[in-house]
Regions:
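Aromatic-rich, lipid-facing transmembrane alpha helices and their immediate juxtamembrane interface loops
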Residues: 1-168
Length: 168
């Protein structure tokens, strides 16, 4: 067991537990949003591994579901839920909120991914460390924008019953 990976998994899991506890204190819906973001992240990671095979995770992660480390899904949730909380706190208009959420999430990912590949957390296929954005292909960032935008759009739509009323 590699100490760096263990520290990352324990640390991110602890942050997720704290975030889940704080979300639950705000109500059931914020908690469900956080848990659904983690589930969404795990499913997307697993799907990418099976379908596209654009990258592979290090075998040094202690906890994984098939090819996707659980900590990755938890960090997805922390990033996406954190972005939506910031957008909500800033009072961004509902129609622009998913776009702002995406920009906030991609801002974090621009920094995280370049560091993560150098730490050996995962390896991109068909791209070297000097290519793309410090070794990260542009497609990764497009995916983050789309995934965050779509998750935010659906979550915010489900969150607000007035958006679902059908005029007769």
């Amino acid at each position: 067991m590699v100490p760096t990976f263990l520290a990352l998994e324990v640390g991110a899991s602890a942050l997720f537990v704290v975030a889940a506890w704080l979300a639950l204190r705000r109500g059931r819906l914020p908690f469900l949003e956080l848990v659904s973001a983690a589930t969404f992240g795990l499913l997307l990671e697993q799907g990418n591994q099976i379908i596209f095979e654009t990258y592979e995770y290090s075998p040094d992660f202690a906890l994984a579901i098939d090819r996707a480390p659980i900590v990755i899904g938890l960090t997805w949730a922390l990033i996406i839920a954190g972005a939506t909380r910031i957008t909500d706190a800033l009072g961004v208009r509902r129609r622009y909120a998913p776009v702002v959420d995406s920009i906030l999430a991609i801002s974090l990912d621009l920094a995280f991914d370049a560091v993560a590949i150098r730490m050996g957390l995962w390896t991109w296929r068909d791209i070297g460390p000097e290519q793309g954005w410090f070794g990260v292909p542009a497609g990764n960032f497009y995916a983050w924008l789309f995934v965050t935008w779509s998750f935010s759009l659906v979550t915010r739509w489900l969150r607000d019953p007035s958006q679902r009323r059908v005029a007769l």
